[in-house]
Amino acid sequence: MLRFSANLSMLFTEYDFLERFDKAALSGFRGVEFMFPYDNDIEVLKRKLRDNNLEHTLHNLPAGDWAAGERGIACIPGREEEFRDGVAAAIRYARALGNKKINCLVGKTPSGFSATEIHDTLVENLRYAANMLAKEDILLLIEPINHFDMPGF
């Protein structure tokens, strides 16, 4: 049986983020996902989920400076500590919200590094995230985005 989740980062955008939970429930969704919960109080998110009888199905690891065009930092050499801090934050939110899936946007290919450095950084960061999430029984997802929709990804 198919199960659909409303992506509250993409749907109902004419409403304030917290109002989108109500709109998703009224539209018949039983699950919701959102890209980045980190600017929201965990207790407020828990209440919105509970009040609307919604399951939180997925959120992303922090992805760097989104406004500046970053789309993940997992592949960027020198940002490993920031990536690890993001894994910890993602776990904290997932635990509190009952989520068992976390998505990693690996990032755009950075300039100034060799392909080997970028590859090795990505592999090490994904390995770290997978191991930390596995300890919490959380599945790490990797979103395959193409170069047409997101150049440089």
Identify the role of each PLM range.
Residues I73-F153:
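Active-site acidic/histidine proton-transfer and metal-coordination neighborhood
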